[in-house]
């Protein structure tokens, strides 16, 4: 299931340090069976290989998954989480969400 507003396979955020040129991301995204991708979640394609989300995983709304990330099977990723490029997460991973609060006068 891919919910509305999700963006899958966009170019990752990568630049060559000396020339400041954007790095071409020519890889892809693999999403396993029975996986849910929440609204307004972004999953960037890999530089060369694959960004991969394992089967039976649940990705909440407003999650950023960067290029070359590998997420195992049965993962649960809550809202507003950002996963940096080339991170490798194993099977049965679960995490909390990000929250922000500021005083209201």
Question: What does each of the following model-derived ranges do?
Answer:
Residues 1-105:
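Structural signal for interior beta-strand "rungs" in well-ordered beta-sheet cores
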């Amino acid at each position: 299931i891919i919910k509305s507003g999700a963006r899958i396979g966009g170019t990752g955020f990568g630049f060559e340090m000396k020339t400041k040129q954007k790095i071409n991301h020519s890889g892809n995204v693999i999403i396993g069976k029975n996986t849910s991708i929440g609204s307004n979640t972004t999953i960037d394609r890999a530089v060369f290989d694959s960004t991969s989300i394992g089967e039976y995983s649940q990705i909440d709304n407003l999650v950023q998954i960067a290029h070359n990330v590998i997420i195992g099977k049965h993962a649960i990723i809550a809202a507003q989480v950002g996963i940096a490029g080339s991170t490798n997460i194993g099977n049965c991973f679960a995490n909390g969400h990000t929250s922000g609060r500021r005083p209201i006068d």
